[in-house]
Regions:
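N-terminal capping/small domains of soluble enzymes
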Residues: 1-97, 102-103
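Short gly/pro/ser/thr-enriched loop/turn and capping motifs at secondary-structure boundaries
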Residues: 49-54, 132-134, 196-199, 270-272
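Small/polar glycine-rich anion-binding or flexible loop at a beta-alpha turn
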Residues: 246-250, 272, 304
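A short, charged, Gly/Pro-tolerant segment at domain boundaries
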Residues: 296-304
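Active-site metal-binding loops of divalent metal-dependent hydrolases
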Residues: 23-24, 244-246
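Alpha/beta enzyme core
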Residues: 33, 37, 104-241, 247-254, ...
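C-terminal helical cap(s) of enzyme catalytic domains, especially alpha/beta-barrels
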Residues: 55-65, 200-214, 256, 268-293
Length: 304
């Protein structure tokens, strides 16, 4: 049996439902010798801001039980250098390219997106309003409902390409934020970004990260992420991209069963950059074994 692996995120058709998450795969060219990039459902780029950012001082990555803490601070090359140095390669790889945008003001989000709109080869945008690692951005946007509305509304007016709002789990009711994004024209939400976490070195009695707290990712957060996807799926009609601790095809299928149309592999890329391809292959195998002719039929198919 031939399994149809295509899924839709707004008007964007993905080859398969497995993308690589922002910040875990660079801009694609870093992994070209290790991964057959055309087999990915898509690449979500490292976050881009208007100007280059050096990020937070080290240490900014710490391994934890079942996961990883990071406090990178949105270090990136800036949008103009991305257009000049990275976008030409991304245009050539034969899979969808989604650019992740981060900013410290609503106007900056709009300016970055406007610059990207002038370029060919970009299939959609993921808007990072939820990064907990930067003191002057991220968290304040992602936990404020009215600002979420404003960002989505203004960016929607600037593009007809798929607009994906990446939500933080560090709020009381995440479905309110998903509904706000949906009401203002977002095509999808990406759920979840990292949880806030902290680790301490008991020998020095100092925090293990220079910024004290950071973003927790990896298998430890998967049950939380699944619950958030499930909550949102019961509240909105737009697509959901599930993120959080996906290491295997089984993990990805869980996200789809509770309502995700697609998934992103993140932390696992640091262990094995080809994880996303293996996850996509595993989803096809599961569908074949269960006589399911389209991966789209997995979305929301959890039995009660």
């Amino acid at each position: 049996m031939v399994v149809n692996t295509e899924v839709n995120i707004g008007v964007l058709k993905l080859n398969n439902p497995v993308l690589v998450a922002s910040g875990t795969f660079g801009y694609g060219d870093e992994c070209k010798e290790m991964v057959e990039l055309h087999k990915l459902g898509g690449i979500v780029t490292k976050s881009l801001s208007l100007n280059p950012r050096i990020g937070n001082p080290p240490p900014r990555i710490v391994e934890t039980t079942g996961g990883m803490l990071n406090s990178i601070g949105l270090a990136n090359i800036g949008v103009k250098k991305f257009i000049q140095d990275k976008l030409p390669f991304l245009k050539s790889i034969g899979t969808s390219v989604i650019v992740n945008i981060a900013a410290s003001s609503v106007d900056e989000y709009c300016l970055v997106l406007s610059l990207l709109e002038e370029q060919e080869g970009i299939d959609g945008y993921e808007i990072n309003i939820s990064c907990p690692n930067v003191k002057d951005g991220g968290l304040s946007f992602g936990t404020n409902l009215s600002i979420t509305v404003e960002i989505t509304k203004r960016l929607r007016s600037l593009t007809t390409k798929p607009l994906i709002i990446k939500l933080t789990p560090n709020v009381t009711k995440i479905s309110d934020f998903a509904r706000a994004a949906s009401d203002e024209g977002a095509d999808a939400v990406a759920v979840i970004n990292t949880l806030v976490g902290l680790a301490v070195d008991i020998r020095t009695r100092k925090p293990k990260l220079s910024t004290i707290t950071g973003g927790l990712s990896g298998p430890a957060i998967k049950p939380v992420a699944l619950a958030k996807v499930y909550e949102i799926a019961r509240s909105v009609k737009i697509s959901i991209i599930g993120i959080g601790g996906i290491m295997t095809a089984e993990d990805a299928i869980e996200f789809m069963l509770v309502g995700a149309s697609a998934v992103q592999v993140g932390t696992a890329n640091f262990i094995d950059p080809s994880t996303a391809v293996k996850v996509a292959d595993g989803i096809v195998l599961y569908c074949t074994q269960n006589k399911i002719d389209s991966v789209q039929k997995l979305t929301g198919a959890m039995q009660y």
